[in-house]
Design a protein with these regions (language model features):
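Basic, polyanion-binding surface patches
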Residues: 2-179
Length: 179
């Protein structure tokens, strides 16, 4: 049964696998979705794209519109592609793809052929963004803002301690990406 399902995924196009819904129709508990799952951030175009795993972020309203935010290290190749394309996707998967998601997080797409080696099937959305056929939920995001948090921006000592510990080297610095 698994092989048949996988074969069908590979043979179908985006419109056969996914349908557009409004953010209000998402039935997942958003805290569970973000806290208990890795997700994949993908940017680029059909000719060249890159993905990385994310493990923090959230969803809500920004400028009266549905928005997402994720945290990306400044040295990530995916961040370069987000800045270039001004769009990206966030995709969630069932647990059976965890090994492949960890593979996407294990090496840089700048220095490897991981997008060719990963056992997930790339798919272009109708908007021209890239994601994967095996995803169970895809968010298409238009870049709104990229910002760097400053230690003085945080009000609690717990947050300040976290940021001070997380940013010990320049390569550790992270950008907050809103879309």
């Amino acid at each position: 049964m698994e092989a048949i399902k996988r074969m069908n995924v590979e043979e179908n196009d985006f419109k056969q696998l996914f349908w557009q819904i409004s953010p209000k129709e998402i039935s997942d508990n958003m805290f569970t979705l973000v806290m208990d799952n890795f997700y994949v951030i993908t940017a680029g175009n059909e000719a060249h794209y890159n993905s990385m795993i994310g493990s923090g972020g959230g969803f809500g309203l920004l400028f009266r519109k549905p928005a997402s935010w994720c945290v990306i290290r400044t040295d990530r190749y995916t961040l370069e592609l987000i800045q270039k394309e001004q769009t990206y996707t966030i995709a969630y998967f069932s647990d059976r793809y965890k090994e492949q998601l960890l593979f996407l997080g294990s090496q840089s797409g700048r220095d490897s052929r991981k997008m060719e080696e990963v056992e997930l099937t790339g798919i272009q959305t109708p908007s021209g963004n890239m994601s994967f056929k095996e995803a169970r939920l895809i968010f298409e995001c238009k870049l709104t803002q990229i910002t760097t948090p400053d230690l003085d921006d945080f009000c609690t000592q717990e947050a300040r301690d976290y940021i001070a510990d997380a940013y010990q080297k320049a390569s550790d610095y992270r950008k907050y990406v809103f879309g």
